[in-house]
Amino acid sequence: MESTTAFSAVTSALGIQDVHIMAPYLWMLVLGFVIAFVLAFSVGANDVANSFGTAVGSGVVTLRQACILASIFETVGSVLLGAKVSETIRKGLIDVTMYNSTQELLMAGSISAMFGSAVWQLAASFLKLPISGTHCIVGATIGFSLVAKGQQGVKWIELLRIVLSWFISPLLSGIMSALLFFFVKKFILCKADPVPNGLRALPVFYACTIGINLFSIMYTGAPLLGFDKVPLWGIILISVGCAVFCALFVWFFVCPRMKRKIECEFKSSPSESPLMNKKNRELHCPILKPDPDNIKLPVDGGIVAEVKVPILDMVTVSRTEERTVTFNMGDCDDPIEKEKLNSMETNIDQPMNGSVQLANGNHVQFSQTVSNEMNSSGQYQYHTVHKDSGLYKDLLHKLHLAKVGDCMGDSGDKPLRRNNSYTSYTMAICGMPLDSFRNWDAEARPDEAEKLTVHGADGKKRIRMDSYTSYCNAVADAHMDVEAEEQEEGCIEDVVTDRKSSSSSLEERHDQDKPEVSLLFQFLQILTACFGSFAHGGNDVSNAIGPLVALYLVYESGDVATKAATPIWLLLYGGIGICIGLWVWGRRVIQTMGKDLTPITPSSGFSIELASALTVVIASNVGLPISTTHCKVGSVVSVGWLRSKKAVDWRLFRNIFLAWFVTVPISGLISAGIMALFKYAILKV
């Protein structure tokens, strides 16, 4: 009696009326809801990075802000747009009429498909690899159908479309993103003053963003919003009208406000503001302490590099004057500076055979080959590193304020990370051997730490460095010495090679958006990310809920080809699961999309978002197979390659492509295994 009451309560809560036919399979419905939630969790952990990965990578929003925005728009999108797409997932892959007399097999197949898709997406999220949720569920659906009914009823054309999308999606989206970013770079980023052109282009960018995304959302034909009753010409008219209105609003209201904001920030703090113009950046500060700390270090070819860390008199220096750090490397073209440098002493201690004494009494000992060339070289080049650069701040903080020698404490144990922006430069000017570093970097994983072995008087000493302590450790180590002459000769050769890589890292640093450009593109990127998240919620909730909808409707009606609409509460259930997955595990794939694959700036992030959205709209309308994930990855790689050819992690891109390749077979195999268990061990049909 109690079990009957509990059963009635469950069926009543689910809104099920006629349950006499499928009542023995209630356990399958409950199991399906549990697995569907896990699948929604995996979709949130992996696929949501498509929307906000680039926004987080460019620094426009924090990870927490991205999760909040994505939770809102994914949930709303799943409820308002998800019903339409669920029909395709439920009926577009297999012929469900084959299961008219064996409804329990279709229910078992839905559970198997969700399980196979969830397992592979969770594994991909653990590996930080963005994959297509749609391809996962398609492969899993084909897998269970092959076990249940063989090749009969499988629509193989869908599988062919998926294979084509591996190449069409990233290539087409990459080309469009590259074209858009080339336009932005040529007419805005490369200008001496990018603000005027940026303000002129702002209405066009907003209009395109609103028009493209609005058309994409309306074209889905979501029945809950009545879009299924709007003809195509009506959708185009509404989208264009909203785009024009948005452009006029931005031109007359947003652009003047943005211009005033930029000018206000520039005038309020001309020396400290990030919007400082180029002339002010070139000013030198003549008011320095009379006795600055001089550090002379060897670079390639035996040429001496002198690092000056001058101290400002904060009372007498005006706001327009800056602190500088100078390096002497080769010939100097400025006659005034040349005369000044010729009057300076090298401060190289000859008896110590190429050692340099720092202000705090520490010595830096160099190899014999380097020290001989140091002593014979008398040519210098004056190079300025200004106070707003990361290298200056690092030097000022570590070499002067921390008094050099004190930096060798706990901070010296931090690991050296791959793609370190300061390490190459540090090693180059300090003459440190780099063979072990490069060999390790070619084999080890990116997140592993490097240990550099340096031979000294006290035996082998391992020095670990990160981007904040590498310079300090290299300069302040008093016991650096090289035993073998082959290693000494290799040191100079390594430095020459490594300075090329250091110049490329400096080049990437200069390729960052100017602050005023970032200000122009920040809200645009947030807007495109929110639109993308809204559309993504409507599209990808079907990947998690589509099989559950089939399971629920079959159980409710006993008919595999029921025409009932998708319940809204089921879509909301999937949206909640997606949001939880995003909050718990979404940061992993977001890091891959926004940081690891290539550096992202607001301008490049906007180009990626808008062009990939446009690609999806065009390809969907002309019938080309397309994947949102593949489009986004293709855009990220192409724009990153256009910004800097060495900025893309091609090894990571190769791994992502391999993950795409195995997505369908792996999810299909897992689903087929679970379906075989259901068919031959549990249901025995």
From Swiss-Prot:
GO terms for molecular function: phosphate transmembrane transporter activity; symporter activity. Pfam families: PHO4. One of its GO terms (biological process) is phosphate ion transmembrane transport. Its main location: membrane. Residues 489-511 are annotated as: Disordered. It is found in: Membrane. The keyword Repeat does not apply. The chain crosses the membrane at residues 21-41, 66-86, 106-126, 162-182, 207-227, 234-254, 517-537, 565-585, 606-626, 656-676. Keywords: Membrane, Phosphate transport, Symport, Transmembrane, Transmembrane helix, Transport. GO terms for cellular component: membrane. Belongs to the inorganic phosphate transporter (PiT) (TC 2.A.20) family. Sodium-phosphate symporter which plays a fundamental housekeeping role in phosphate transport. This is Sodium-dependent phosphate transporter 1-B. The gene is slc20a1-b.
